[in-house]
């Protein structure tokens, strides 16, 4: 009896020890640290935040001759709503513009001529400034365009983040052709679509970084000279012929080369860009009633701005119309 008691006690102690070890292992497996490491219980990684207007770089191309005639109109209207996102690229210093725009006025060393090299020089400056900004989208417009920031943001948000995007309005109903120089004095005929710069276009950063070998620094002008085409065509050439990308055509961009009167008033708030000018000898503007007369507002941009932003201080109040 005295010999069995220690054996029974030892067995009981051994059983308790095993149970204690199992319990300890169980609690270790359920510790907060282990729960966080369990794949099934991990929180999903949040994706990039939704695109905001401050993620977009808007470049306006102009020249000294249009500083007063065109730019002041833009500064009074849509640029007043996108001042932090908008950069104006010109060929000559302007004290008045400098006071209004500060560092957002970029004076290039480009010629004031309306030639392929001069236009490509300014586009190269726009592209390089965008790359240095770190922003998510590059949008180019001319100084006769009205940009609707709400419609622009709605359009850009619709594109998948993981895709290369080149969106704008082609000016032709067919691809353009170019002769691409080859070794041994040969040439190769290539064809591609491009978005006309006169209506504006946008490129996301993912695509812009891939374009850098042909578009950054002096290489954009070199590429333009190689195919003997202007800046907007060169953009399309790089994207489609060098990178295998594709233009996403959008009817929401407009230039003065189309019949703008065909747009109904109800459609205007949906358009990303609008324009004005003389086409085939006639004034080509959107059809929009008031609040300013055609004599007061020949471009109709001020009336359009009041339609989109009736709270603008210089817009006539609703009760006074």
UniProtKB/Swiss-Prot annotation:
One Gene Ontology term from the biological process aspect of the record: regulation of Notch signaling pathway
Bilayer disposition of the protein: Single-pass type II membrane protein
Keyword Acyltransferase included in the entry's annotation: no
Sorted UniProt keywords: Developmental protein, Disulfide bond, Glycoprotein, Glycosyltransferase, Golgi apparatus, Manganese, Membrane, Metal-binding, Signal-anchor, Transferase, Transmembrane, Transmembrane helix
Annotated substrate binding sites: 70, 143
UniProt enzyme class: transferase
Residue spans crossing the bilayer: 8-27
The family this protein is said to belong to: Belongs to the glycosyltransferase 31 family.
Full protein name: Beta-1,3-N-acetylglucosaminyltransferase manic fringe
Protein's organism: Pan troglodytes (Chimpanzee)
Taxonomic classification: Eukaryota, Metazoa, Chordata, Craniata, Vertebrata
Gene that this sequence comes from: MFNG
